[in-house]
Amino acid sequence: LTDIKHALFQNPLGVKMWDVSAAKAHSSPNDWHSHPGGIARIGHQTDGFAFDNEGPAHRVLLEPFALSSRLVTNGEWDEFIADGGYDTATLWLSDGWGWVRENAIRAPLYWRDDEQFTHAGWQARDPDAPVTHISYFEADAFASWAGHRLPTEFEWEAIARGQEGELPAHDPQGGNQLDDATPPLPRGGGELFGDCWQFTRSGYLPYPRFQPAEGAVGEYNGKFMSGQFVLKGASCATARGHSRASYRNFFYPHQRWQFTGVRLAKDI
């Protein structure tokens, strides 16, 4: 669906996949999920299906941190732009600043004026909807501008799994994910899963004792563990079978055609 959307966007005839108006997004307060830190068990831990890059399960040490209860919105991204976010070199990683200047990046992909492109064509941009189609470079710059940071993949997964007796777990099937009856569109609402894939600051690297699976599945994951970043959480175009705490999506830092977004983190 994301490939189809990109193809429609590049078509000068204004072709649509659906002819519907976007529903208004849910507005949620920005609270924080706090985690006390300590030893967390990460990776696929059940007998169900998982790709080889989701394991082996292992332990990591976390310092105390907090994860935002909702995704960054279009309205907040407008504030970033208005404050000179795309013109302030100090906010950007060196490679990211070079990418911005070389490609004249001024806004997320599929934005123009106060509209954004969807599977149903150009529509008014909802300020309360999660911002999507941004690169890792943009996500990192926004986090710097906001005075926070991106989470690590381990922090994100620890919040998703919860902590017995202290922190509730989050339902991987509970968010806005693929529905055959409606076009994929981020709506917000505060769920950890769904709406858009969320960038982490973790490089896409093998877990301790990782061994590629035999056959075609092993060809897909291990060979791409170079120069990419991990994303968590599933999107509005993700089948629910791919939504789980251990799932590791991965993209190069300049790529934007997927439903990618931002959830902020901070140290506590």
Predicted segments, located by residue:
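Functional-site microenvironments in short loops/helix caps that host divalent-cation chemistry
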Residues: 3, 7-51, 55, 70, ...
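Short proline/glycine-enriched turn/loop segments at secondary-structure junctions
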Residues: 218-222, 249-256
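Short, structured beta-strand segments at or near domain termini in extracellular proteins/domains
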Residues: 256-268
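Acyl/amide activation-and-transfer machinery of modular secondary-metabolite enzymes
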Residues: 57-63
